[in-house]
Amino acid sequence: MIINSIIEFLQAADIKKQILGIDFGEKKVGVAISNIEHTVAMPLQTIFATNQDRINKIQEIAVAYNIGAIVIGLPFKLDGTETSQTHRVKDFANKLANKLLLPIFLCDERLTSKAANNLLKMGNIKRKVRNAIDDRVAASIILEGTLKRMQNSKSYF
């Protein structure tokens, strides 16, 4: 089930389980995971796969970590309008929702990839390494933002 509201997400998610964060890309998919308390988001891995293989790998991760919900970053232009990538992410999210039967929250991810890259640059991470891990760091930034919104929501407690 695709969800666009944090309140609906909190009602649908199994909050006793970890949450997965995803930064979708055509070539790479970054994956992050929360701790069980939903206070920290940690980069987990980068998936280098296409089409159905991405879905299958995410399903394997969801089963292995007993995931209760998923957060996927939804890209928009800075002015809030949709892009062709926005539509690709929505299509991916729908396919994932049909396969996993978990609540999926689509959240605004404007500037998260840039933030991830800047964070890695500040850590003096070499470009080749940055390119290999920037998507999973972006996924953790996306997930971290949602975790903060969850903690700030009165319905979470």
UniProtKB/Swiss-Prot annotation:
Q: State the superkingdom.
A: Bacteria
Its Gene Ontology cellular component terms are: cytosol
Question: By its UniProt entry, which SUPFAM superfamilies does this protein fall under?
Answer: Ribonuclease H-like
Q: Which InterPro entries match?
A: RNaseH-like_sf, YqgF, YqgF/RNaseH-like_dom, YqgF/RNaseH-like_dom_sf
What GO MF annotations does this protein's record show?
Answer: nuclease activity
Keywords for this protein:
Cytoplasm, Hydrolase, Nuclease, Ribosome biogenesis
Q: Which SMART domains match?
A: YqgFc
List the subcellular locations.
Answer: Cytoplasm
A Gene Ontology biological process in which this protein takes part is:
rRNA 5'-end processing
To which protein family does this belong? Belongs to the YqgF nuclease family.
Describe the function of this protein.
Could be a nuclease involved in processing of the 5'-end of pre-16S rRNA.
Instruction: Please report the name of this protein according to its UniProt entry.
Output: Putative pre-16S rRNA nuclease
- Mind giving the lineage of the organism this protein is from? Bacteria, Pseudomonadati, Pseudomonadota, Alphaproteobacteria, Rickettsiales
